[in-house]
A protein has these predicted regions:
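Short, flexible, solvent-exposed loop/turn segments with mixed acidic/basic and small polar residues
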Residues: 102-105, 202-211, 239-243
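Short Gly/Ser/Thr- and Asp/Glu-enriched loop/turn motifs at secondary-structure junctions
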Residues: 108-111, 212, 243-249
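C-terminal catalytic subdomain
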Residues: 136-184
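Conserved PLP-binding catalytic core of the aspartate aminotransferase-like
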Residues: 166, 172-175, 179, 185-232
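PLP-dependent enzyme catalytic core of the Aspartate aminotransferase-like
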Residues: 222-275
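Flexible, glycine/charged-enriched surface loops at secondary-structure junctions
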Residues: 104, 135-140, 155-161, 188-197, ...
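Short acidic (Asp/Glu) and glycine-rich catalytic loops that position anionic groups and cofactors
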Residues: 121-127, 154-163, 208-213, 247
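Conserved PLP-enzyme active-site core in the AAT-like
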Residues: 1-152, 186, 267
Length: 275
C-alpha cells in the first residue's frame, strides 16, 4: 500500500509459494528503479515452497539498490535459544543489501518506530525527502530507542530487555518460578490449582508458527466461570492478562516477573472474595 501511494510501479516477482533467481533476472529491465525483498516475519508459507535469499539477489542486481524489509528486526541469533533461524539486521547488511528496514518494537524490544539502516548513498537520499519532517519520530521515542540499543551494546544487559528476556528464558528457570508462584496461591478457596506445561507464542507479528515450551499456573474456578474470572483480571487497574484453555485460566510464567507474584495473589483473592 505504501509503495502504491508513492505512485511507484510495482512488479511482483515469482509466485506465492515458489520464486527462483531467474524470476528476478527476467523481471529486471531498463525501467527498474530498485529491488524490494520483504521477509515473511508475520506469516509462513508451508509445503511446496522455494525462495531466493538476499545474498543471491545481490549477485544479479548490478547498480540497482536492493532493499530488504525484515519486519521484526532481531539483533541476536535466536537459534542459540532453541528457536528457528530469524534473519538478523547484521546478516541482511552483510549479504549485500543496500537498505534494510525493520521495527523498533517487536523483537528489538524498543518503542514503536520504523528504522532504516544502509549505505550512506541511499540514507542521504532518504534524509532529503520532504516527507521526513512529517514522519520522523519524536525526542521521547529517540531517547527510548537509544536506551534499548545501549542494552544491546552492553552484552550483560541485553537479556534485561523484557522481550528478549521472555523469549530466551530457559524452561528449567520457568519451571522453578512456577513452583514459587504456585506455593503463594496454594490453598486459595474457590479454585483448583495445578502447574501445567504449555507453549508460548511470541506474537506481535513475529516468529509465526513458533512455540516455546513453558509452564503455567492452571486455575479452575468453582464458583464463577473462567470467562468471568478472566474478565475480572483483565479489567483491573493493573490488568492481569491470561488465556482460557478448556474452560480453565492459564497464567503463563514466561510473561510474568517475580515482582508481580504478590500482585497476582492479592488480586485473585480480591476477585474470589478472600480479601
Amino acid at each position: 500500500d505504501v509503495c502504491e501511494r508513492s505512485l511507484a510501479t510495482l512488479r511482483e516477482v515469482g509466485t506465492t509459494n515458489k520464486t527462483h533467481l531467474r524470476d528476478y533476472e527476467n523481471a529486471i529491465n531498463e525501467e527498474t528503479g530498485a529491488i524490494l525483498k520483504v521477509h515473511t516475519s508475520n506469516y509462513k508459507i508451508l509445503g511446496f515452497t522455494e525462495s531466493v535469499s538476499a545474498s543471491e539477489i545481490a549477485t544479479i542486481k548490478g547498480d540497482l539498490p536492493l532493499i530488504e524489509d525484515l519486519g521484526s528486526g532481531v539483533l541476536i541469533n535466536l537459534e542459540d535459544y532453541g528457536l528457528e533461524h530469524e534473519p538478523t539486521v547484521m546478516e541482511s547488511v552483510a549479504s549485500g543489501v543496500d537498505v534494510v528496514t525493520f521495527s523498533g518494537d517487536k523483537l528489538l524490544g524498543g518503542p514503536q518506530a520504523g528504522i532504516i539502516v544502509g549505505k550512506e548513498k541511499y540514507i542521504s537520499q532518504i534524509k532529503k525527502n520532504q516527507l521526513l519532517r512529517a514522519l520522523r519520530v519524536d525526542k521521547m521515542t529517540i531517547a527510548a530507542l537509544e536506551t534499548i540499543l545501549n542494552y544491546y551494546i552492553d552484552k550483560n544487559k541485553t537479556f534485561e530487555i523484557p522481550t528478549i528476556k521472555m523469549i530466551t528464558e530457559s524452561f528449567e528457570s520457568i519451571e522453578n518460578r512456577a513452583e514459587k508462584l504456585f506455593s503463594m496461591l496454594e490453598g486459595m478457596a474457590g479454585v483448583e490449582l495445578n502447574i501445567v506445561e504449555t507453549a508460548s507464542e511470541v506474537g506481535g507479528g513475529s516468529l509465526p508458527n513458533q512455540f516455546i515450551k513453558s509452564k503455567a499456573i492452571e486455575i479452575d474456578p468453582k464458583n464463577i466461570s473462567a470467562a468471568k474470572l478472566e474478565e475480572g483480571l483483565r479489567k483491573l487497574e493493573v490488568p492481569i492478562i491470561t488465556r482460557i484453555y478448556k474452560d480453565k485460566i492459564l497464567l503463563d510464567l514466561r510473561t510474568i516477573d517475580e515482582e508481580e507474584y504478590e500482585i497476582i495473589a492479592n488480586e485473585l483473592k480480591g476477585i474470589l472474595g478472600e480479601r
